[in-house]
Regions:
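Hydrophobic residues within alpha-helices
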Residues: 26-27, 46, 115, 160, ...
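Helical "substrate-binding/catalytic lid" subdomain
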Residues: 175-301
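Rossmann-like NAD(P)(H) cofactor-binding subdomain of soluble oxidoreductases
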Residues: 61-66, 70, 75-143
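Rossmann-fold dinucleotide-binding core
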Residues: 106-190
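NAD(P)+-binding Rossmann beta1-loop-alpha1 motif at the extreme N-terminus of oxidoreductases
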Residues: 4-74, 99, 104, 135, ...
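Hydrophobic beta-strand scaffold residues
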Residues: 37, 57, 126-127, 168, ...
């Protein structure tokens, strides 16, 4: 199998379901790479905007999936993905035998396993390809993708993934493995946010300018995008508009703990972050970026702002 990124692109008929902050940019990049896109979204405004860019718009998920080689979903949570896939007029009703559903949402391991079984019973194929990145990266086609599924399905969907991301990583042949990797990655991001918030609170309380702390950290031992990006957001108190909403972060924290419980793996840090999310939601911060959990660490330290 050729590496991702060097595969000669093949124009495909693609259904894309879910045109939110991430999905809209992803669908546009499919169009830019010459793919034919038929889209569906619950609310009409994002669909109308994508139609102006050249996509066809379907009235139902089943209609979108009808005639598609692959149907890609980018939706908020388990409930939305299950409803759009297996509910009345769901994509599974329209997807042809042999065609593939590619779930790109951050969903539970359990739902991914259920979708794989449901599609197999219908003679359809299934792969999971959740993404790492924020909305600006989705618009620029610079996402990172964790993909898992049967080798022939992964091979078939590569042109679409190459249009959406800068690099894809094949995790395995069981789709749910990609979902576990995605949940693990999001768990690590929340640990970074919490540790930065605590470090900024400590140094601020000690009378140190936190921007200097951030500069030192990110130009030496912590020169990674996640520290730079979230450190800058926290320092600037730039929690709105949200790149990833607090409520979604809390959802992912819950899902990683469910996965860990099933595998009998303790995640003590996940429990700490869970309480940060619950406190943030209790304070009315559900619409803010998930990095606003940093506000709670600042409050605990008696500091006026996280950075």
């Amino acid at each position: 199998m050729a590496p991702f990124g060097v595969y000669r692109s093949k124009a495909m008929n693609i259904a894309f379901l879910g045109l939110g902050g991430m999905g809209g940019g992803m669908a546009r990049n499919l169009l830019k790479h010459g793919h034919s896109v038929i889209a569906w979204n619950r609310s009409p405004e994002p669909a109308a905007a994508l139609h102006a860019d050249g996509a066809r718009i379907a009235a139902t998920p089943a209609e979108a999936a009808s005639g598609a080689e692959i149907a890609m979903t980018m939706l908020a949570n388990d409930e939305a993905v299950e409803s759009v896939t297996l509910g009345a007029n769901g994509l599974a009703e329209g997807l042809a035998k042999g065609a593939a559903h590619v779930s790109m949402s951050t969903i539970s391991v359990a739902l991914s396993e259920h979708l794989a079984t449901a599609h197999e019973a219908r003679g359809q194929r299934f792969a999971a390809a959740p993404v790492f990145g924020r909305p600006d990266q989705a618009q620029a086609g610079k996402l990172f993708i964790a993909v898992a599924g049967a080798a022939d399905v992964v091979e078939r969907i590569r042109p679409a993934l190459d249009a959406i991301g800068q690099r894809s990583f094949v995790i395995g042949e069981t789709p749910a493995q990609a979902n576990l990797v995605k949940l693990t990655g999001n768990f690590l991001i929340t640990c970074v946010i919490e540790s930065l918030a605590e470090a900024f609170a400590l140094t601020a309380k000690g009378g140190i300018e936190t921007s200097k702390v951030h500069e030192l950290l990110t130009e030496t031992l912590f020169a990674a995008p996640v520290y730079k990006t979230y450190g800058e957001i926290i320092l600037a108190n730039r929690f709105s508009p949200a790149g990833f909403k607090m409520a979604l972060g809390q959802k992912d924290n819950r899902l990683v703990q469910l996965a860990a419980e099933k595998l009998e793996v303790p995640l003590p840090f996940a429990a700490i972050v869970r309480d940060r999310f619950l406190a943030a939601l209790a304070h009315g911060d559900g619409e803010l970026d998930w990095s606003a959990i940093a506000k709670r660490a600042a409050e605990d330290a008696g500091v006026t702002k996280p950075g």
